[in-house]
Amino acid sequence: MNQQNNISTPKGRRVFLRRILFFLFLTLAVIALVLGLNLKRYTDRERKQDKIEKEITTEREKDGVGNLHKKYKDMIGWLEIKGTGFSYPVMQTGIEGHHKDDWQYYLHRDVHGEYSFYGTPFLDVRCTTDSDNLIIYGHNINGRRYFGYLQNFREETFFRKHPKFSFTAVGEKEKEYCVVSVLETDKYADTPAVIASKRMLDAACLLYTSDAAD
């Protein structure tokens, strides 16, 4: 037997140990590379999203919701909790002239129609901006971004400080809504809250969150 490959000899054990260390180093290098690439994708995604949000918020403050609609044809309004970072455009598709066959078009698209992990809040196709009940969907993002921010309503101090939110529809004045109830539920379960929200399209104003982007 070749002494170099015989781990029962000192030389064989050294060769075997070097091989183990080499494969261990190679494995760690691959893991580090994958983690590095994932971190870069995450930071690039965050940077791009921050830029989009800053641009459209600046445009809204400068030109108003009506003029924004001229640039973003699917935009139907703006949703905001004043005094917080919760301030987003609301889109709607699934209707004539607006991606009729895909009412969830903005589930994973930004305001420009490009792929986005975060998506953009959008109004249920069954609603119009003058409906009694506006069902608006948005991702429940970890870190309380987008509709993940609504988790703050679990805290009574936040609720008391921010008891209202506003919605400004294109061509209309800003309307304020009082938060009278906050329900947290599983969107896949037929809980009373989910059943009620599906049936009562003329009752109250609801904000839906999706956990698809947790």
Enumerate the language-model features and the residues they cover.
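N-terminal membrane-targeting segments
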Residues: 2-63
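Intrinsic disorder/low-complexity detector
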Residues: 4-8, 126, 213
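Exposed alpha-helical structural elements
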Residues: 51, 149, 199-200
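Short extracytoplasmic
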Residues: 57-78
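Cell wall/extracellular polymer interaction/catalysis modules
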Residues: 71-182
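Acidic, glycine-rich loop-and-strand cores that form catalytic or ligand-binding grooves
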Residues: 177, 181-207
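Conserved small/polar residues in nucleotide/adenosyl-binding loops
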Residues: 208-214
